[in-house]
């Protein structure tokens, strides 16, 4: 986002004009219905004792703005003796968000706050450190972006906030969200990723952006090597997908980054799970935080998601995959595989059969990965074949179906994969292909979910109609993969990544995310 400026230190007039109130007043969340009935005429005492009072009518249900699974975990149970309560949909204005940002939310189609936003935004506006625990697709980005932008409106300053994300795709997505929400207030946002030119990034940092969104490895490179770059005046720190940051061994880098930051700051830590590593990071980086959780359990999936499986012989996996893609033809599909090579092969297989498939994995260059995501988001490709690089954090709207061609190795990854669909209250479908070799993993996944999943209804004869065409496409895919590997072998191999410009290359591979 480009913005004309007279001086680097001058803040945009739009920031000053739309200054936010320092202590926004929150409106009441619920209206209480008085349903107690009074008798106009006196009755006999014996009738009162003999007849029991009629049970109160159930409160009217309001259509939830987001999935009900999340709401259940943060709503207090009402005792039968208590008066009934009608839940009223809140707006962002009700949470204390100023008009300029509410207008930006409306433009982006954010009608009502999600549960994590509803719980965390008022606390963030009170200048509290926050730990937010919520499933993927729950709207965590806006939950921390809106309070930061509102604080920036109140007291404009350069290098105001830093957001750390585990992967380049997630960082790019967060930066886009900040730019979209801050479009009416002349926000300047810098995206600092590994694999990009350090000099160009240093120039962007020298322009003193309001918000920096970065992957940890490349940010530390700039803190250590870029002359004149300092975050000592930074006021907000966000660590998004904190559990993923620590799973990718960013812990030592985060410790070093924290030493470059001021102690007097607000810190928001958002995560899908609360592991022991995340708790350690919390103790090291947050002060007297308030915990907000809208996760019903560790392996929760949203209520709008329909999950099924097909149990088949391993030799027919591709045939069943093609059948399922044909069943969901015209809809957007993400297919998850376990390896980079399998991702590439499946994409070639489906393209050979005339389907618009595109691969996404850690072996691709950064520009190729962003290009694949943009094509899928824009609808020019209806099928995204991906490794777990796409399972966490990426905001890919309107995904109709997720197919697990290869099962993940753990239950947590399963939840994150299927969380790519049925986002923000929308419905979605997830189907897992289970073979005789996957039974142990599948039983562990069902045990973690706490219930058995239903088998997807299909007729074997209808599936086997695709077998001859699939076998022909498999042969073509094998030949193309062989040629691809031979060509890539001459240039360092499909799985090898090129270093950046020689600066910080040792850390660049970490935020690239393995395939």
Swiss-Prot record:
Residues 25-55, 506-515 have a biased composition (Basic and acidic residues). A motif (Q motif) lies at residues 90-118. Its EC number is 3.6.4.-. Residues 69-85 have a biased composition (Acidic residues). One of its GO terms (biological process) is rRNA processing. GO terms for molecular function: ATP binding; hydrolase activity; RNA binding; RNA helicase activity. Residues 1-85, 482-515 are annotated as: Disordered. It is found in: Nucleus. ATP binds at residues 134-141. Keywords: ATP-binding, Helicase, Hydrolase, Nucleotide-binding, Nucleus, Ribosome biogenesis, RNA-binding, rRNA processing. A motif (DEAD box) lies at residues 240-243. Residues 316-464 form the Helicase C-terminal domain. Coiled coil: none annotated. One of its GO terms (cellular component) is nucleus. It is an enzyme of class 3 (hydrolase). InterPro entries: DDX47/Rrp3_DEADc (IPR044765), DEAD/DEAH_box_helicase_dom (IPR011545), DEAD_box_RNA_helicase (IPR050079), Helicase_ATP-bd (IPR014001), Helicase_C-like (IPR001650), P-loop_NTPase (IPR027417), RNA-helicase_DEAD-box_CS (IPR000629), RNA_helicase_DEAD_Q_motif (IPR014014). Residues 121-292 form the Helicase ATP-binding domain. Residues 15-24 have a biased composition (Low complexity). The Q motif is unique to and characteristic of the DEAD box family of RNA helicases and controls ATP binding and hydrolysis. Required for pre-ribosomal RNA processing. Involved in the maturation of the 35S-pre-rRNA and to its cleavage to mature 18S rRNA. Belongs to the DEAD box helicase family. DDX47/RRP3 subfamily. This is ATP-dependent rRNA helicase rrp-3. It comes from Neurospora crassa (strain ATCC 24698 / 74-OR23-1A / CBS 708.71 / DSM 1257 / FGSC 987). The gene is rrp-3.
């Amino acid at each position: 986002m480009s913005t004309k400026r007279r001086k680097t230190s001058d803040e945009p007039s739009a920031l000053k004009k739309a200054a936010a109130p320092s202590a926004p007043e929150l409106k009441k969340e619920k209206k209480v219905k008085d349903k107690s009935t009074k008798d106009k005429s006196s009755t006999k005492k014996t009738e009162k004792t003999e007849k029991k009072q009629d049970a109160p009518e159930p409160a009217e249900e309001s259509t939830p703005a987001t999935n009900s699974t999340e709401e259940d975990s943060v709503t207090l149970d009402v005792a039968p003796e208590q008066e009934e309560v009608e839940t009223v949909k809140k707006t962002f204005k009700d949470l204390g968000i100023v008009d300029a940002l509410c207008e930006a939310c409306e433009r982006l189609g954010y009608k009502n706050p999600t549960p994590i936003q509803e719980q965390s935004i008022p606390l963030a506006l009170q200048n509290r450190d926050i730990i937010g625990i919520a499933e993927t697709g729950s709207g965590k980005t806006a939950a921390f972006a809106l309070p930061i932008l509102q604080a920036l409106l109140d007291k404009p300053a350069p290098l105001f906030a830093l957001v750390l994300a585990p992967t380049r795709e997630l960082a790019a997505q967060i930066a886009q969200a900040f730019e979209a929400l801050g479009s009416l207030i002349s926000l300047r946002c810098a995206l600092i990723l590994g694999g990009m030119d350090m000099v160009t990034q240093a120039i962007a940092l020298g322009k003193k952006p309001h918000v920096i969104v970065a992957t940890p490895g490349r940010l530390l490179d700039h803190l250590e090597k870029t002359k004149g770059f300092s975050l000592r005046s930074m006021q907000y720190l966000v660590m998004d997908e904190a559990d993923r940051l620590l799973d990718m061994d960013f812990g030592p880098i985060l410790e070093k980054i924290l030493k470059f930051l001021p102690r007097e700051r607000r810190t928001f830590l958002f995560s899908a799970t609360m592991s022991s590593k995340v708790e350690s990071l919390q103790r090291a980086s947050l002060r007297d935080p308030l915990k907000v959780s809208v996760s019903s359990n560790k392996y929760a999936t949203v209520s709008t998601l329909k999950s099924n499986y097909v149990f088949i012989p391993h030799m027919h996996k591709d045939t069943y995959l093609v059948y399922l893609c044909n069943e969901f033809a015209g809809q957007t599909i993400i297919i998850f595989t376990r390896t980079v090579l399998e991702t590439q092969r499946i994409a070639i297989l489906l393209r050979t059969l005339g389907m618009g498939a595109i691969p996404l994995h850690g072996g691709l260059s950064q520009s190729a990965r962003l290009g694949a995501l943009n094509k899928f988001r824009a609808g020019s490709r209806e099928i995204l074949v991906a490794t777990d690089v796409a399972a966490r954090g990426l905001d890919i709207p309107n995904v109709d179906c997720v197919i697990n061609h290869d099962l993940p190795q753990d239950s947590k990854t399963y939840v994150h994969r299927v969380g790519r669909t049925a986002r923000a209250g929308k419905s979605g479908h997830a189907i897992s292909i289970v073979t005789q070799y996957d039974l142990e993993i599948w039983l562990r996944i069902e045990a973690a979910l706490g219930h058995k999943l239903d088998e997807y209804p299909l007729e074997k004869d209808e599936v086997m109609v695709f077998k001859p065409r699939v076998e022909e496409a498999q042969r073509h895919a094998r030949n193309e993969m062989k040629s691809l590997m031979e060509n890539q072998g001459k240039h360092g191999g499909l799985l090898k990544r090129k270093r950046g410009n020689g600066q910080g290359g040792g850390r660049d591979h970490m935020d690239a995310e393995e395939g």
